[in-house]
């Protein structure tokens, strides 16, 4: 087989917060690659997962949920979605959430009307909705997005309809040599996923504004293929009042967080670790250009 017979390209996923894009990324990747939470706005940076076949390589891109920016970090998140759609996408994938009002999707639909690449629509969570409602949504989407390549009713959580969708994407990709070596499944280092899985557990264990105000930095990551595998991570919050919430009475909350995050990390990496967590305050870091540069959200 030559490169002329091979197809590869980027499939950029767009949707509202909590539409199920990260769950879909895990489904197409065949594993727990992306951090997920029932709470919205879990994804802050573009994350890719590779799906390979004998004659194709699909690079799926999970982007932050489309939302109105209220602070600098959200502006960056929104910008990363726009850049991925406008500059990187060979295929665009609109993950529609039928649990949210159709009107809530209007601004994103307007954005998708201007893309130049083939567009697939996935109406997710189809197992939770009557078929009549799904058909009405499909009809309205075809009116608003007349150039849709194909629409799928799927359940990313149940992995239903995902295989058919992947086949359709693979057929639509341009002829290219593979972008990544065979067997590679992402472009991120293990440290990134360790931080993401700690933050995932923060989202799952804490309430109100606290999860949204946290950033996790992995300070130490050592391995000796034995009992001394060790990770130390620092959890940043924005206010002093949030620090005792993370820690809890006599350290009870952070102990629970450590156990659940360590389990998740060990499942992902396939080996045992000792995880240590520390909490620090970085005032208003989500709106601070200096902090966002320090944390890698701004690279210029």
From Swiss-Prot:
It is a peripheral membrane protein. GTP binds at residues 15-22, 62-66, 124-127. Residues 154-156 are annotated as: G5. Residues 62-65 are annotated as: G3. Residues 198-283 form the KH type-2 domain. Residues 41-45 are annotated as: G2. Its main location: cytoplasm. GO terms for biological process: ribosomal small subunit assembly. Residues 7-175 form the Era-type G domain. An essential GTPase that binds both GDP and GTP, with rapid nucleotide exchange. Plays a role in 16S rRNA processing and 30S ribosomal subunit biogenesis and possibly also in cell cycle regulation and energy metabolism. Belongs to the TRAFAC class TrmE-Era-EngA-EngB-Septin-like GTPase superfamily. Era GTPase family. This is GTPase Era. It comes from Elusimicrobium minutum (strain Pei191).
């Amino acid at each position: 087989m030559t490169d002329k017979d091979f197809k590869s390209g980027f499939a950029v996923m767009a949707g509202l917060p909590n539409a199920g894009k990260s769950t879909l990324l895990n489904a197409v990747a065949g594993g727990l690659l992306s951090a997920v939470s029932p709470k919205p706005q879990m994804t802050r940076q573009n994350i890719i997962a590779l799906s390979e076949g004998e004659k194709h390589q699909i690079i799926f891109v999970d982007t932050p949920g489309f939302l109105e920016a209220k602070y600098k970090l959200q502006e960056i998140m929104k910008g990363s979605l726009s850049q991925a759609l406008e500059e990187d996408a060979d295929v665009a994938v609109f993950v529609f959430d039928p649990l949210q009002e159709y009107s809530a999707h209007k601004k994103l639909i307007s954005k998708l009307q201007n893309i130049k690449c083939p567009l697939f629509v996935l109406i997710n969570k189809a197992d939770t909705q009557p078929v009549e409602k799904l058909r009405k949504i499909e009809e309205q989407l075809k009116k608003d997005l007349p150039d849709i390549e194909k629409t799928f009713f799927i359940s990313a959580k149940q992995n239903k309809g995902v295989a058919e969708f992947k086949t359709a994407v693979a057929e639509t990709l341009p002829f290219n040599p593979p972008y990544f070596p065979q067997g590679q499944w992402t472009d991120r280092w293990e440290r990134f996923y360790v931080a993401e899985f700690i933050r995932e557990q923060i989202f799952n264990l804490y309430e109100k504004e606290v999860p949204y105000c946290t950033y996790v930095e992995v300070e130490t990551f050592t391995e000796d293929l034995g009992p001394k595998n060790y990770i130390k991570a620092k959890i940043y919050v924005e206010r002093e009042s949030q620090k005792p919430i993370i820690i809890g009475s006599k350290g009870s909350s952070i102990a629970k967080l450590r156990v659940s995050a360590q389990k998740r990390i060990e499942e992902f990496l396939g080996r045992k670790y000792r995880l240590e967590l520390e909490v620090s305050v970085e005032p208003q870091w989500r709106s601070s250009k200096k902090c966002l540069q320090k944390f890698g959200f701004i690279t210029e």
